[in-house]
Structure formats: structure tokens, C-alpha cells
Curated annotation (Swiss-Prot):
Source species of the chain: Petrotoga mobilis (strain DSM 10674 / SJ95)
An example molecular function term from Gene Ontology annotations: ATP binding
Pfam families assigned to the protein according to its UniProt record, in alphabetical order: CTP_transf_like
Keywords: ATP-binding, NAD, Nucleotide-binding, Nucleotidyltransferase, Pyridine nucleotide biosynthesis, Transferase
Record-linked CDD domains: NMNAT
Entry's family note: Belongs to the NadD family.
Protein name: Probable nicotinate-nucleotide adenylyltransferase
GO biological process: NAD biosynthetic process
């Protein structure tokens, strides 16, 4: 089984790391892919560090042998639609789990070709907010990852840096100085 954990990782932070570790421990996938988006369709390109930088950060944050940081979305057409990544990966592995946050689940029905995604993967959802399943506009079949709610976001980190506030402990030391420089 392949676990796919995609995102802008703008920047990758301790919350991403915690979620990935728990998902790996819980599901023990054959492969665990960390996939930074090249050009996420729902994000403004003005606020995103370039792909090579985010890819490099992910390589240093997710350094264990059981994580594999993939540049696949850098090779696929833009924008970086999840379905394109899944279709490419399904050439090699038909058993794909897609790891997403509960906040993404709420708007999943707005994703490009979301119904096709559901036919090709099993959704694994990590908790982000205290919301009931029935608050989603579409009923999805998914597995909920048993993990603590990690309320750290890349947006929060970027905002703190812009205000000159500390983000110590929220970002891996291996990328700390680069992240500060990028978003200051």
C-alpha cells in the first residue's frame, strides 16, 4: 500500500511531521510519499516559496528511510491537481491511501475531479477541527487517523514570521534559518 501525503508545505512544519509519523505507525505502508505541490490550484502563487526550495525543506524534515519525498508534481502539468498525481502513481500501485486534513475534507467536493479521486484511493483523514462528520456537505467514506489535533498551519507560521514573532519549535531546526529568511 502507498500512503500519499501531499500539500504545499509552505513551509513544512512540526505538525506535518507529527501527522506523517502517526500515519506511518498506524498504517505501515510499503511506501510513504511526501509530495509537495508545484502549483496548488487553490493557493496564490505570490505567497508560495518556489518548488525547489519547498522540496529541499521536505527532504530535510522527512529524512527517515520510510519517507520518500517525491518531485512528481514538478514533472506533471500545472496546476497540481491531486487526480493527476494519483493517476500517475496508480500505474505503479493500485492500493493508494490519500492522507488529508479534516479541513480539506470539508471542501473535498470542490476538488478537481473529486469523484474520480474517491474511486482510486482510500481517504485517510487527520483531525484538524472539532467538527462532526455531518457538517460536511457531501458524505464521504474515509478512515479517521487517531491522532491529536495539531493546530499548527503553514499560514500561521508565515504570519508570525511577518510580524517578527518567534516560530521556534514549530519548524525543524534543519530548515529554520532558511524559512525565516524566505518569509521575513
Amino acid at each position: 500500500m502507498l500512503m500519499l501525503f501531499g500539500g504545499s508545505f509552505n513551509p513544512p512544519h512540526i505538525g506535518h511531521r507529527i501527522i506523517a509519523e502517526i500515519a506511518y505507525d498506524e498504517f505501515n505502508p510499503d511506501r510513504f510519499l511526501i509530495v509537495p505541490s508545484k502549483n496548488p490550484p487553490h493557493k496564490s502563487i505570490d505567497f508560495i516559496a518556489n518548488f525547489d526550495k519547498r522540496y529541499s525543506w521536505c527532504e530535510r524534515v522527512f529524512f527517515e528511510h520510510y519517507f520518500e519525498v517525491s518531485d512528481i508534481e514538478n514533472k506533471l502539468p500545472s496546476p497540481s491537481y491531486t487526480i493527476r498525481t494519483i493517476e500517475y502513481l496508480s500505474n505503479f500501485d493500485k492500493n493508494i491511501n490519500l492522507l488529508i486534513g479534516e479541513d480539506s475534507l470539508k471542501n473535498f467536493h470542490k476538488w478537481y475531479k473529486w469523484e474520480e479521486i474517491l474511486k482510486k484511493v482510500k481517504l485517510v483523514v487527520y483531525p484538524r477541527y472539532f467538527e462532526e462528520k455531518n457538517s460536511y456537505s457531501v458524505d464521504f467514506d474515509y478512515v479517521k487517523l487517531e491522532s491529536p489535533i495539531v493546530e499548527i498551519s503553514s499560514t500561521y507560521i508565515r504570519q508570525r514570521i511577518k510580524k517578527g514573532k518567534t516560530v521556534k519549535g514549530l519548524i525543524d531546526d534543519k530548515i529554520f534559518e532558511e524559512v525565516l529568511k524566505e518569509y521575513s
